[in-house]
Amino acid sequence: MRIVLVGPPGAGKGTQAAFLARNLSIPHISTGDLFRANISKQTELGKLAKSYMDKGELVPDEVTIAMAKD
């Protein structure tokens, strides 16, 4: 099962994701957490994501997916 929660900052995505993960026994993957961890560790994917974020652009799906697979 895959569930994607979309919304602006502060909309409650994290709260709802935690609720669903807990009650449906499914993993909770936060792209924001993935970005922050990779940027903090200065991984190649983190540097690439940061280059998009610094320009105010969305991080391409390919980069996000690669982080999730890592």
UniProtKB/Swiss-Prot annotation:
It is an enzyme of class 2 (transferase). GO terms for cellular component: cytoplasm. ATP binds at residues 10-15. Coiled coil: none annotated. Keywords: ATP-binding, Cytoplasm, Kinase, Nucleotide biosynthesis, Nucleotide-binding, Transferase. Residues 30-59 are annotated as: NMP. The keyword Transferase applies. It catalyses: AMP + ATP = 2 ADP. It comes from the Bacteria. Its EC number is 2.7.4.3. SUPFAM superfamilies: P-loop containing nucleoside triphosphate hydrolases. InterPro entries: Adenylat/UMP-CMP_kin (IPR000850), P-loop_NTPase (IPR027417). AMP binds at residues 31, 36, 57-59. GO terms for biological process: AMP salvage. It is found in: Cytoplasm. GO terms for molecular function: adenylate kinase activity; ATP binding. Pathway: Purine metabolism; AMP biosynthesis via salvage pathway; AMP from ADP: step 1/1. Pfam families: ADK. Belongs to the adenylate kinase family. Monomer. Consists of three domains, a large central CORE domain and two small peripheral domains, NMPbind and LID, which undergo movements during catalysis. The LID domain closes over the site of phosphoryl transfer upon ATP binding. Assembling and dissambling the active center during each catalytic cycle provides an effective means to prevent ATP hydrolysis. Catalyzes the reversible transfer of the terminal phosphate group between ATP and AMP. Plays an important role in cellular energy homeostasis and in adenine nucleotide metabolism. This is Adenylate kinase.
